[in-house]
Amino acid sequence: MFCGEDFRFGAGAEGTPDLLKRMAPCPVAVLPLKEAGGEKVSSSRIKRLLADADMAGANALLCVPYFIQGTVEHGRHVGSGLGFPTVNLALPAEKAFPREGVYGGRAETPAGEFPAIVNIGARPTFGVQEKKIEAYLDGFSGNLYGETVRLFPEEYYRPTTAFPSAEALKEQLARDIARLRERSRK
């Protein structure tokens, strides 16, 4: 088991790493604190950066880039009907997520890696308030149902928006994809 030297647990946060070492049924390694930018690196700090959609800031503190992994499930097939098929993932309850919105990034799939537009949250244009993760994989055509994919939201583009029509949404998606392609060329 690992914990930081400032780790606290229990009622009133009175449990210390030394107490954990005495109580734990396994070895406990107490790790020294790390700093970045003059501030302690902590899960709270990383969660705050994610909530602010500061993916570069969060990734600078993580050992690996932030990603969301899940099994592709069937959605409502609205994206396909608009000409922008997406992969749909359930939101894992135990994961810290970035601010709801639309991100440019990439996807790792069994078929390879693709630039991706990642939507985290509701789909208000179609009255869907259930929060999901869906991604358009630029350059991919095929079926990934039941496959495991990793989505890497890397740059916040915009908040989720209720568009006045499906056509208005399609126009915005085309702009998002153009921005993604420009970003991918760099």
Residue ranges and their predicted role:
Residues 2-85, 108, 164-170:
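Classical nucleotidyltransferase
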Residues 75-186:
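Phosphate/ribose-recognition catalytic cores of enzymes acting on nucleotide-derived substrates
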